[in-house]
């Protein structure tokens, strides 16, 4: 049985930002992967790597902010100081969250539409899997490249 090398990427903006630096270092060392998996922002990062868009991915991450992925979003590191500093952003975010029954991630969807290349994704020899959350049930959903229906790449 041939051994395969896999890269697993987490969800969460801070983890994703850290992982981009680690991925860049691995690629600069000439490391390659047969399988890439990701959750949330890690799935976007992984899909772009599968497409062969590492350089474009690095440029995308250099310009990302909370509002690049979520309308009415705000940065929160768990500290009270940050909470008070961002208090003007919290009320609009909470109102939007309650009214829409979740965060408005239309900016994140736009990134997927703008950067996703279904043809290159499916043509790549790199296997891919992701975990997403089914809304509004908030149940996990797993999808692999081999099971993903053509024409629905950007929906995942």
Residue ranges: model-predicted function:
Residues 2-112, 140-156:
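Patatin-like phospholipase
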Residues 67-74, 116-129:
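A short alpha-helix-loop-beta-strand transition element characteristic
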Residues 128-139:
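Internal, conserved structured core segments that host functional sites
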